[in-house]
């Protein structure tokens, strides 16, 4: 009996293995490489090196506000120069990494993280690592805290007469995104002086929400799955875009990005907040698939400081 079972088991394996192999191949085919994957083979690079794809690293840092070459020849070459080293040190300081100026493992890992497309540094003025000391009155004493929120250049904000804002979705927006975005607006309303209401008038709404892909005409193209996830513009522009090519989910689901979490972050930009260096803050720039976050004290302090209340 046992001897007959072995050939039968082998026969089943011969039938199943090709199917499993095809499933694995199909899964690999569906998984597109991250736009930031090029960073992996640059790990260990430092000043003085000349390595293929360093120009892509320069472009990455330029996109997020860390680097700007007057001479475009240097921007497009693969030389690890003084400017690049300085930009990497600034990036490392912003993300609480050791400021070595080299592409060590921790720096590469952080740079490869999916993130918001809004720059960390805008025209060289807005720094995540600001570490602003604030005094918060508490009875007869002042509570001393260090804040890490930031603002857009010039500190744009909604006028005092416009504390109620309307928002609208682009007609045809996926139905499962409506409730998470509405909840995100409700959360900000509960923690600020703002109130929000949904309108069907997309043209005249104060804030517009849509899913876009690649170059969509706003000067900030998306880059496909796993790179930049969403972006929004400073007051009083009002545009908020999700990357349509990402996997999105209403719940915190492995392999997908949480719609409400990213909405909370981008609404922060819509209200005037830049990025924070506090990892627990909603305004921290990077997000992982399956991650769910809420507002942090630093986010709320930032809005209160910007609007002076």
Q: At which residue positions do the language-model features occur?
A:
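Zinc-dependent metalloendopeptidases
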Residues: 2-309
């Amino acid at each position: 009996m046992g001897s007959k079972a072995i050939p039968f088991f082998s026969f089943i394996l011969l039938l199943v293995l090709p199917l499993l192999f095809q499933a694995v191949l199909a899964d690999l085919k569906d998984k597109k490489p991250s736009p930031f994957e090029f960073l992996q083979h640059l790990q260990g690079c430092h000043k003085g090196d000349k390595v293929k794809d360093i120009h892509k690293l320069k472009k990455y840092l330029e996109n997020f506000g860390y680097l700007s070459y007057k001479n475009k020849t240097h921007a497009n070459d693969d030389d690890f120069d003084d400017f690049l080293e300085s930009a990497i040190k600034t990036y490392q300081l912003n993300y609480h990494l050791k400021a070595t100026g080299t592409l060590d493992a921790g720096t590469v890992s952080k740079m490869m993280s999916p993130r918001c497309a809004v720059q960390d540094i805008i025209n060289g003025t807005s720094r995540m690592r600001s570490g602003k000391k604030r005094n918060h009155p508490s009875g007869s004493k002042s509570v001393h805290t260090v804040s890490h929120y930031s603002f857009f250049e010039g500190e744009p904000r909604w006028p005092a007469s416009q504390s109620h804002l309307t928002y609208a979705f682009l007609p045809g927006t996926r139905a499962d995104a409506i409730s998470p975005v509405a909840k995100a607006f409700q959360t900000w309303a509960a923690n600020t002086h703002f109130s929000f209401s949904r309108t069907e008038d997309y043209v005249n709404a104060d804030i517009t929400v849509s899913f876009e892909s690649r170059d969509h005409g706003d000067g900030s193209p998306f880059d496909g799955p796993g790179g930049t996830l969403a972006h929004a513009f400073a007051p009083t522009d009002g545009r908020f875009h999700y990357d349509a090519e990402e996997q999105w989910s209403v719940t915190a689901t492995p392999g997908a990005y949480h719609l409400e979490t990213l909405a909370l972050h981008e609404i922060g930009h819509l209200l005037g907040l830049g990025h924070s260096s506090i990892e627990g803050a909603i305004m921290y720039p990077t997000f992982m698939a399956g991650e769910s976050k809420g507002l942090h004290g630093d986010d709320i302090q930032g809005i209160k400081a910007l609007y002076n209340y």
